[in-house]
Amino acid sequence: MELGKSTTIRSIMNLINKTSGKVLIENKEFDKDDIEIKEKIGYLPSEIYLYDDLTVKEMLDYHESFYKKDIHKRRNELIKKLELDEKKKIEDLSLGNLKKLGIILAFMHKPKILILDEPTSGLDPIMQNVFYDLLKEEKSKGNTIFYSTHILSEVSKICDRVGIIKDGNLIKVEKIEDLSKKSLTFVTITSEQSKEIAKDLKVNIVSEDGNAIKFGNNLPHDELIKKLSKYKIDRILI
């Protein structure tokens, strides 16, 4: 289901026209002709379209030519970390390697603001961890990272604040620690005392089937197990 994450990012980047509202970056309204702000942004779209007939090296050379400052050293650092072959043609790159190239293009000019749309899709688990380390490095420099993902584990690893979008509307913005306190895990218990357990825990039953009940739990697991220890339970699934 399309929630509006990519549309929001494309709107921020002035790739599509906004129907209402405005985008402020560094307390300044950002429009498509503002070169000064654009140079501070590293953008990674969810789908990457580049010049297929170029090699990786030629694409990076072309991108580097737009910047007056020396970014060659940073470019080489990123190539080494992400293990990308510069000799390959873009049309021959796998989805994972194309994503690596997109990451390098977004990061190599040392931007102060990173706007990343589903950046880990296509990366294997090892490269995902390399990417997370890159983000932590950028964060330690005081740079801003605007990150779109539907993977909740990434949110907890990376983010300080979380904005939740539903049906194209931003419905909530919270600090990650506050959101974590409210997060639920679903528990299924099979017991002849299941109704009594639900009443004792003060939970709402999501579904039930005979002696089995499913409910949302926000207690730490050790505390939940301690509360359940006084009951005879045939089966528990967390």
Language-model features and meaning:
Residues 21-32, 36-37:
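Conserved ABC transporter NBD signature motif
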Residues 114-118, 123:
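Catalytic Walker B motif of ABC-type/P-loop ATPase nucleotide-binding domains
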